[in-house]
Amino acid sequence: MITVHISGGEKMLKEAKKVSKKTKIIGVSVLTSLENNDLKKFYNIDNSKKLVSKMTKVALKSKIDGIVCSPKEIKIVKKISKKKLKIITPGIRLKNNNISKDDQKRIMQPKEAIKLGANYLVIGRPILNAKDPMKIINLINEEKI
C-alpha cells in the first residue's frame, strides 16, 4: 500500500494508480489531528464529514483502492463508496489511554471502528507507549478494549 493525499486531485490520483500496477493506492482524506475550525482555514469547509464526503467521491472517480479516514467518517465513506474502497482508520485510541496531550482529535476505540466497517486500523502510540505492548496487542485482538 502507498498513500497519497486526495487533496492532490483526481489527475494525480489517476496517475498514481496508472503507474502502480501491483501496489494498492490509498487516498488520505482529512487528517485525524484536524478539527472543524482547522478545516475552515485550510479548505474553507467547517465540517469534516462534508469534506470527507467530497474526497470519497474524488477517490471513487480516480479508481484508487482505498481511503484513510477518521473513524468518525467511516459511515459516510461506506455509504458513498458502497464498499468499493478499503477503509484504513487512524485515530484509534484505547479506552483507558491518557489522551489529554494527544494531537488526535477525531478518535474511536478499536472495537467500535471495526463494527462501523474499518478494514484496517492504524494503532501507533497506544501500543508503542504501552508498558507492555504485546499485552495491548493481544487485548485488541481479543476485542477486550
Enumerate the predicted regions with their spans.
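Structural motif
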Residues: 62, 116-117
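C-terminal helical cap(s) of enzyme catalytic domains, especially alpha/beta-barrels
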Residues: 13-19, 114-116, 126-145
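Conserved anion-binding
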Residues: 1-75, 79-88, 93-99
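Glycine-rich beta-strand-to-loop/alpha-helix junction loops that act as flexible
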Residues: 89-90, 123-126
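Short hydrophobic alpha-helical runs that function as membrane-insertion/retention elements
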Residues: 68, 121-123
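Glycine-rich phosphate-binding loop at the start of an alpha helix
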Residues: 53, 107-108
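Short glycine/threonine-rich catalytic loop with a Thr-x-Gly-x-Asp
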Residues: 100-106
